[in-house]
């Protein structure tokens, strides 16, 4: 329950923490302070927001000493539970919630039944594409919809803008879902699950349990959606009280979306309808077919016409940093897949192209790169440029499959220029790191934008 006169300490001044500051600033009786391990001088954007909203900043020592002055600790995603401030809060019996939960509590405080217009998407891969495509479906049908969460603005930031006539589709992560209390979407979906963020969750079972929280508060009035082709997600919605919807690249007898005779077909309310031939879907890549099916399934409980779904699928080409064509230079295509932050995502990227030079590496999240190395060899990737924290692990995996054509470089600039020098007309230079960006960049977006700026700086026609 949201307390509009509460005393909130926000832990973390990244995108989510800043969103929480902006959201809580709409309630004049709320008392808000912020803490972060970083010096405020090093996070100027955040400092400007604090100044604008007259929110004090506490260093780590001050926040621990003054913690008892607050009612609720709002943590940013990804901050581990062994953080000193979280540990102290638990000792004091203080509620610890995530920014996502704060946003939902504000929605519930302001609106009538906000859950009826809320869709949430999680999974290891495909979240951003699926979330954006759902937004496109609703916009094509004339609805007002916010695309938010990990893509767009944090829920807590938009929670005071949303009206009772707006829809919201959220991309949500395992970090956020681990700490929900009342969060309840009308439609909740898990796209797929492969090992990721094991450095944070500890093991795969913990990661899966966090993802499953997306169904935690659903009732019989809600809908739970899973990918029945994914052996890990299949059946995860059994414990959900929501109505079960499925999607598959194979024919289904249950309600949901699937492929039959090369057509996307929906089956809902005892009506089976063919929507579009899969070759007429603009979004490239076999893996994106799953994202299309998931997004289509999310529309079934709402009044989205088949024509609007069809027209959107003919026009939607994808999102930035996910198999994004940056430029074709002297016959060489440069593809930005900086969103490929884990092995499974990059495997799908590799399988989308032929005749490629790959750029990979980044923050070590505890991944096993053996399957990645095998795919590189089997696909016949011409060369691989490795950089970042994981270069040794990936190189070792490549050595074990007797793949010698890799080069270790210090930075992305060297990788891009080297790959371009090696490439010939018809080749693809693919940035798909299979790793997070945090060893060298603040986000995968900044890494992808740096890649694009390097590509645009290359000569040629």
UniProtKB/Swiss-Prot annotation:
Subcellular location, record wording: Cytoplasm
Positions bound to ATP: 123-129
Gene3D superfamilies reported for this sequence: Mur ligase, C-terminal domain (3.90.190.20), Mur-like, catalytic domain (3.40.1190.10), NAD(P)-binding Rossmann-like Domain (3.40.50.720)
EC category name: ligase
Alphabetical UniProt keywords: ATP-binding, Cell cycle, Cell division, Cell shape, Cell wall biogenesis/degradation, Cytoplasm, Ligase, Nucleotide-binding, Peptidoglycan synthesis
Cited Pfam families: Mur_ligase_C (PF02875), Mur_ligase_M (PF08245), MurD-like_N (PF21799)
EC numbers, comma separated: 6.3.2.9
Catalytic activity: UDP-N-acetyl-alpha-D-muramoyl-L-alanine + D-glutamate + ATP = UDP-N-acetyl-alpha-D-muramoyl-L-alanyl-D-glutamate + ADP + phosphate + H(+)
Gene Ontology cellular-component annotations: cytoplasm
Pathway: Cell wall biogenesis; peptidoglycan biosynthesis
UniProt cross-references to InterPro entries, sorted A to Z: Mur-like_cat_sf, Mur_ligase_C, Mur_ligase_C_dom_sf, Mur_ligase_cen, MurD
Biological processes annotated in GO: cell division; cell wall organization; peptidoglycan biosynthetic process; regulation of cell shape
Cell cycle in keyword set: yes
GO molecular function: ATP binding; UDP-N-acetylmuramoylalanine-D-glutamate ligase activity
Protein family according to the UniProt entry: Belongs to the MurCDEF family.
PANTHER family per record: UDP-N-ACETYLMURAMOYLALANINE--D-GLUTAMATE LIGASE
Function per UniProt: Cell wall formation. Catalyzes the addition of glutamate to the nucleotide precursor UDP-N-acetylmuramoyl-L-alanine (UMA).
Protein name: UDP-N-acetylmuramoylalanine--D-glutamate ligase
């Amino acid at each position: 329950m949201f307390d509009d006169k509460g005393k909130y300490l926000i832990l973390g001044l990244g995108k989510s923490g800043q969103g929480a500051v902006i959201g809580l600033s709409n309630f004049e009786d709320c008392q808000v302070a912020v803490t972060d391990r970083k010096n405020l001088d090093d996070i100027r954007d955040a400092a400007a927001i604090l100044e604008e909203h007259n929110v004090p900043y506490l260093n780590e020592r001050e926040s621990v000493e003054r913690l008892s002055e607050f009612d609720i600790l709002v943590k940013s995603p990804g901050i581990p539970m062994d953080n000193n401030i979280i540990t102290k809060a638990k000792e004091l019996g203080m509620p610890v919630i995530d920014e996502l939960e704060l946003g939902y509590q504000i929605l519930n405080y302001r609106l009538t039944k906000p859950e009826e217009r809320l869709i949430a998407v999680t999974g290891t891969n495909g979240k951003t594409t699926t979330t954006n495509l759902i937004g496109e479906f609703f916009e094509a049908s004339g609805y007002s919809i916010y695309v938010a969460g990990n893509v767009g603005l944090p829920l807590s930031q938009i929670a005071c803008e949303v009206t009772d006539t707006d829809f919201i589709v959220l991309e949500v992560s395992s970090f956020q879902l681990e700490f929900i209390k009342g969060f309840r979407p009308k439609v909740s979906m898990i796209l797929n699950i492969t090992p990721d963020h094991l450095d944070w969750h500890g093991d795969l079972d913990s990661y899966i349990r966090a993802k499953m929280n997306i169904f935690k508060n659903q009732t019989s009035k809600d809908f739970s959606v899973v990918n029945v082709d994914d052996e890990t997600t299949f059946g995860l919605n059994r414990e959900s009280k929501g109505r079960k919807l499925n999607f598959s690249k194979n024919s289904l007898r249950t309600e949901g979306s699937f492929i039959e005779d090369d057509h996307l077909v929906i089956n809902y309310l005892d009506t089976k309808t063919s929507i579009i031939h899969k070759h007429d879907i603009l979004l490239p890549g076999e893996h994106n077919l799953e994202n299309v099916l998931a997004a289509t399934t999310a529309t079934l409980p709402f009044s989205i016409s088949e024509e609007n779904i069809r027209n959107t699928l003919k026009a939607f080409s994808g999102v930035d940093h996910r198999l994004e064509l940056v430029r074709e230079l002297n016959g060489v295509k440069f593809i930005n897949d900086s969103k490929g932050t884990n092995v499974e995502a990059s495997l799908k990227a590799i399988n989308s192209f032929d005749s490629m030079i790959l750029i990979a590496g980044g923050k070590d999240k505890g991944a096993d790169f053996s399957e990645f190395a095998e795919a590189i060899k089997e696909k016949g990737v011409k060369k691989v440029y490795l950089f970042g924290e994981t270069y040794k692990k990936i190189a070792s995996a490549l050595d074990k499959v007797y793949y010698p054509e890799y080069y270790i470089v210090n930075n992305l600039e060297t990788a891009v220029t080297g790959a371009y020098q090696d490439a010939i007309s018809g080749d693809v230079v693919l940035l798909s790191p299979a790793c997070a960006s945090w060893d060298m960049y603040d986000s995968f977006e900044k890494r992808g934008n740096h890649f694009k700026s390097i590509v645009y700086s290359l000569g040629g026609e």
